[in-house]
Amino acid sequence: MIVLALTHLPPPQTTHNDGPARPLLEILRQPVFVVAALTGLIGYGVMNLAMTATPLAMHRAGFDFDHVATTIQWHVLAMFVPSFFTGYLTARVGARSMIVLGCLLLAGCGALAQLSATLHGYYAALILLGLGWNFTFLPATGLLTETYRASEKARAQAANEFLVFSTVGMTALLAGPLEASLGWAGLNAVLLPLALVPIIALLWQRLANGVNSPQIRH
């Protein structure tokens, strides 16, 4: 409450009529929308699947509850503390560069899981996982704003959130069975290449639209 009281928020801007809204399918087929939505669902999905499986894997490996709780605490800090400067970094280097960095951090979590199953290995992997989520999901959300006009905002954001959080729900349900059948290292071996898919999508977008994709004027 104190932070809210001391924070100056600009007054809401009046939305100007920018013409009729395009069909939803036309919005979804834009390369920039594909990249933004794919990055969001991959970043959130990979993070949620690994995070949800972590307590199960650590319990199976013989770690006690305190170790599991501390691991998740470090992970949550890595998810949200960078938010204080993620926007600044995104403005400086661009959303696409931040997405690449986030994907590499997510892949780093998957790689580290193959190398170390020690307590500190779990700490490091979950910290990388949290940072990777922050550096993919937040820039992807910003990138999404390049894909719609003011009159299309609600539908475009609703479609994106449906895709992202449907993935989150599925990964939460799949975490237990996948960890039980594949193990911690095997699960992360599957997640590692998935974490790199947004980078491939960015390369595809670059070929489709050029380096500087045209932005929608609001």
Q: Each predicted region: which residue ranges?
A:
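C-terminal membrane-cytosol helix-exit motif in multi-pass small-molecule transporters
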Residues: M1-T14, A201-R206
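Juxtamembrane intracellular "pre-TM" segments in multi-pass secondary transporters
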Residues: H8-A36
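Pair of pore-lining "gating" transmembrane helices in MFS-fold secondary transporters
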Residues: R29-A50, I127
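Short amphipathic helix-loop junctions that connect adjacent transmembrane helices
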Residues: T52-T71
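Helix-to-loop junctions at the C-terminal end of transmembrane segments
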Residues: V81-A95, E179
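C-terminal ends and interior cores of transmembrane alpha-helices
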Residues: L105-A117
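Intracellular juxtamembrane helix-capping segments at the cytosolic ends
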Residues: F135-Y148
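A late C-terminal transmembrane helix in Major Facilitator Superfamily
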Residues: E152-S181
